């Protein structure tokens, strides 16, 4: 994650999102697979567009693998994005075993977001973090403060904040936490700033804000909160924000 030198302007990493389903770029509302918007046929076009607008990294999501469908449905698209841009790529969705971890790292993915398996088998996740230091990110997706799993199709009884605290006590090798408030995702209503503040207080693991980042004011507020990073999705696709301005406001230049 980014470091900030004394006296410098706050800097927040921006991760433009590309969600993939059947090899195409899409967006879901609140993780609902029946509320899908498809943005053309070729995700590489968006990857190049974000790069030309100032993106220094990309956040990719395999929606097919996330809910247990074919783990290979989007593999070709991921590889083409990496080859076309050369940008560091963070990827989530269906990362539930070491074979998948090794396969995606070999394709060129920089780091992987692990959600469901991290919650259900924290011993395994800690082991993988220690085996692949700095390569694994805990994906904590919350609905009403509880961790959701299986592509957001199931909600557990585990508090998102307690889960983050326990992870930090087990290993120093987690790269980051991507924290998503499902109620905010794709709704264009702003992030859950209160939840983000609670999560930041629960752990010193670098936090990536995800879900509902919609306006330039949202970006400014996240910077003021000293949020290390943010994922921006639908607002870019819908033209509500220009990535170049988002990057400028975040100081990610």
From Swiss-Prot:
Listed GO biological process terms: L-histidine biosynthetic process
- Top-level taxon of the source organism: Bacteria
Q: Which Pfam families match?
A: His_biosynth
Q: Name one GO molecular function term.
A: 1-(5-phosphoribosyl)-5-[(5-phosphoribosylamino)methylideneamino]imidazole-4-carboxamide isomerase activity
Catalytic residues as annotated in Swiss-Prot or TrEMBL = 19, 141
Protein family (similarity comment): Belongs to the HisA/HisF family.
Q: Which HAMAP family match?
A: HisA
Q: What is its EC number?
A: 5.3.1.16
Catalytic function, reaction form: 1-(5-phospho-beta-D-ribosyl)-5-[(5-phospho-beta-D-ribosylamino)methylideneamino]imidazole-4-carboxamide = 5-[(5-phospho-1-deoxy-D-ribulos-1-ylimino)methylamino]-1-(5-phospho-beta-D-ribosyl)imidazole-4-carboxamide
Q: What is this protein called?
A: 1-(5-phosphoribosyl)-5-[(5-phosphoribosylamino)methylideneamino] imidazole-4-carboxamide isomerase
Location in or out of the cell: Cytoplasm
Keyword set for this entry?
Amino-acid biosynthesis, Cytoplasm, Histidine biosynthesis, Isomerase
Q: What class of enzyme is it?
A: isomerase
State the PANTHER family in the record. 1-(5-PHOSPHORIBOSYL)-5-[(5-PHOSPHORIBOSYLAMINO)METHYLIDENEAMINO] IMIDAZOLE-4-CARBOXAMIDE ISOMERASE
Task: Name the InterPro entries for this protein.
Answer: Aldolase_TIM, His_biosynth, HisA_bact_arch, Isoase_HisA-like, Isoase_HisA-like_bact, RibuloseP-bd_barrel
Q: Which organism is it from?
A: Rhodopirellula baltica (strain DSM 10527 / NCIMB 13988 / SH1)
Main localization is cytoplasm
The residue ranges crossing the membrane are none
One Gene Ontology cellular component annotation held by this UniProt entry: cytoplasm
UniProt keyword annotation of Amino-acid biosynthesis present? yes
This protein's pathway reads: Amino-acid biosynthesis; L-histidine biosynthesis; L-histidine from 5-phospho-alpha-D-ribose 1-diphosphate: step 4/9
């Amino acid at each position: 994650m980014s470091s900030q030198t004394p006296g410098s302007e706050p800097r927040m990493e921006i991760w433009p999102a590309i969600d993939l389903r059947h090899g195409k770029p899409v967006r879901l509302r609140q993780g609902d697979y029946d509320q899908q918007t498809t943005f053309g046929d070729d995700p590489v076009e968006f990857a190049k567009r974000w790069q030309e607008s100032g993106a220094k990294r990309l956040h990719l999501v395999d929606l097919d693998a996330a809910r247990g469908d074919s783990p290979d449905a989007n593999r070709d698209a991921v590889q083409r994005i990496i080859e076309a841009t050369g940008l560091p790529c963070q990827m989530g969705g269906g990362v539930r075993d070491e074979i998948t971890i090794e396969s995606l790292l070999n394709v060129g993915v920089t780091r992987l977001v692990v959600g469901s398996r991290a919650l259900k088998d924290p011993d395994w996740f800690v082991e993988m973090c220690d085996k692949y230091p700095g390569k694994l990110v805990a994906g904590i997706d919350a609905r009403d403060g509880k961790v959701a799993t299986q592509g957001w199709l199931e909600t557990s009884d585990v508090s998102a904040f307690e889960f983050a605290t326990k992870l930090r006590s087990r290993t120093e090798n987690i790269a980051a936490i991507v924290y998503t408030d499902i109620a905010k995702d794709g709704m264009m209503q702003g992030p859950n700033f209160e939840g983000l503040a609670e999560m930041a207080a629960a752990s010193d693991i670098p936090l990536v804000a995800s879900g509902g980042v919609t306006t330039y004011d949202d970006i400014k507020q996240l910077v003021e909160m000293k949020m290390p990073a943010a994922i921006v999705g639908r607002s870019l696709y819908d033209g509500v924000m220009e990535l170049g301005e988002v990057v400028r406001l975040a100081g990610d230049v």
